[in-house]
Amino acid sequence: MQAIKCVVVGDGAVGKTCLLISYTTNAFPGEYIPTVFDNYSANVMVDSKPVNLGLWDTAGQEDYDRLRPLSYPQTDVFLICFSLVSPASYENVHANWYPKVRHHCPSTPIILLGTKLDLRDDKETIEKLKEKKLAPITYPQGLALAKEIDSVKYLECSALTQRGLKTVFDEAIRAVLCPQPTRPQKRACSLL
């Protein structure tokens, strides 16, 4: 069985842990507890191939900036996450997460993921954003950012409703099993 290491990064509170818990246990966690580091594992079949998917949850908070890269070596694929209802987390993909990931892992495939899809059409959430003269991130905006950072895919999901959830991890596995031909074959990560 092939083992694939997937590291999940993004701002604090964008839903990285909920994403992983919902996917691996089919249950949505009730309370928010900021992560330092956690690992999850799932044995899955993708395109008739058995895969052991190692999922590495990381801390989004700045306090862990020096610790986080310790989880990067030998990463096969990154999920860079932002919340569809947090424009600041969307901006931080380009300003923070993408440059950091690329610095440590220049050729590892990236999937850009918009989380909290269930809240994009939520009236209360939209109103709160409007009060701050903000709006949820649209699918075309996500797609544009994915192109900018040269991610292999742009996906959106909801850990709460599980809409699009399985697709995220299937596509992460496919990014490793069926790499895009323009990318170099060497995918190992190294710390400098």
From Swiss-Prot:
GO cellular component: cytoplasm; membrane
Subcellular location: Cytoplasm; Membrane
Residues with Cysteine methyl ester modification: C189
GO MF entry, a single one: GTP binding
Its membrane topology: Lipid-anchor
Motif (Effector region): 32-40
Major localization class: cytoplasm
Documented EC number(s): 3.6.5.2
Entry keyword Cell wall biogenesis/degradation: no
Sorted UniProt keywords: Acetylation, Cytoplasm, GTP-binding, Hydrolase, Lipoprotein, Membrane, Methylation, Nucleotide-binding, Prenylation
Residues holding GTP: 10-17, 57-61, 115-118
UniProt modified residues of type N6-acetyllysine: K147
Similarity-based family: Belongs to the small GTPase superfamily. Rho family.
Protein task: Plasma membrane-associated small GTPase which cycles between an active GTP-bound and inactive GDP-bound state. In its active state, binds to a variety of effector proteins to regulate cellular responses, such as secretory processes, phagocytose of apoptotic cells and epithelial cell polarization. Regulatory subunit of the phagocyte NADPH oxidase complex that mediates the transfer of electrons from cytosolic NADPH to O2 to produce the superoxide anion (O2(-)).
Protein name: Ras-related C3 botulinum toxin substrate 2
Organism (species): Cavia porcellus (Guinea pig)
Gene name of the record: RAC2
